[in-house]
Amino acid sequence: MKNLRNRSFLTLLDFSTAEVEFLLKLSEDLKRAKYAGIEQQKLVGKNIALIFEKDSTRTRCAFEVAAHDQGAHVTYLGPTGSQMGKKETSKDTARVLGGMYDGIEYRGFSQETVETLAEFSGVPVWNGLTDADHPTQVLADFLTAKECLHKPYKDIRFTYVGDGRNNVANALMIGASIVGMTYHLVCPKELEPDPELLSKCQEIAKTTGASIEITADIAEGVRDSDVLYTDVWVSMGEPDEVWKERIALLEPYRITQEMLNMTENPNVIFEHCLPSFHNIDTKVGYDIYEKYGLKEMEVSDEVFEGPHSVVFQEAENRMHTIKAVMVATLGD
């Protein structure tokens, strides 16, 4: 077993290929044990703080269920549940929580904040999402791909379609470079990833055999893909001008059945971190329809609900992979 005890999980850039593969294998083992009813608790007596500056369904539920399964207690601090960033600095909050808790999860805006929590709390800190990165999501995405495709990670051709600067796109590119995947990013030139991050990933890829390719050409980019992946085009709270600009750029990149056919792979799977705007059955979805006339955004309802979609298996795997991170870094 790899010794990751007391390590924080802030970005996959902090981990080696062997360490990432260990976490993925541990996720498989823990999932199998839960299904078989033979799970052994490694977090008994541990207290975990969950800091959420941004609301969440999957991340919160995954951390709470994983902690409960493993015997830990959690305290949820929602967007209005603490003074961090308002009356108290993140450095001070880190030192307060570090004296009471054995581990801290943070989901919010700034990568700098999660790094500050890790530096000053003295306990493992786990990144549940920042504007720059989403490392726990990637573990679930990769585990799901392996389960569905029955291929080792290095043989998977993983394609992200959409906004190449998105935090999930960033995290996937990092993860793919570490485990040796072929990673295609299909996006408009205006939405290509940060050059510094791309350079880091390309350097890692030289040592792992990974391949990173970026193109605006949809047909070229998706051909032979094993996985097509997308995420929302715009985050809530961004102004109307941004929505209009982003929709104009990304509407050709909506994942449709036609795009799945372009892969020329009958076994291609569709992944999405969720939530997804694939119909108008939500308030946000209906508002988008009213403002922009779109009944679906980043993915068609046909693909989302179709046989290639594995998004709910992927969502469940958030819990198993998050459990692996907590057990590996905090478990007895």
Swiss-Prot record:
L-ornithine binds at N167, D231, S235, M236. GO terms for cellular component: cytoplasm. Pathway: Amino-acid degradation; L-arginine degradation via ADI pathway; carbamoyl phosphate from L-arginine: step 2/2. One of its GO terms (molecular function) is ornithine carbamoyltransferase activity. Its main location: cytoplasm. Carbamoyl phosphate binds at S56, T57, R58, T59, Q83, R107, H134, P135, T136, Q137, C273, L274, R318. The keyword Isomerase does not apply. It is found in: Cytoplasm. GO terms for biological process: arginine biosynthetic process via ornithine; arginine catabolic process to ornithine; citrulline biosynthetic process. Its EC number is 2.1.3.3. Pfam families: OTCace, OTCace_N. It catalyses: carbamoyl phosphate + L-ornithine = L-citrulline + phosphate + H(+). Keywords: Arginine metabolism, Cytoplasm, Transferase. Belongs to the aspartate/ornithine carbamoyltransferase superfamily. OTCase family. Reversibly catalyzes the transfer of the carbamoyl group from carbamoyl phosphate (CP) to the N(epsilon) atom of ornithine (ORN) to produce L-citrulline. This is Ornithine carbamoyltransferase 1, catabolic. It comes from Streptococcus agalactiae serotype V (strain ATCC BAA-611 / 2603 V/R).
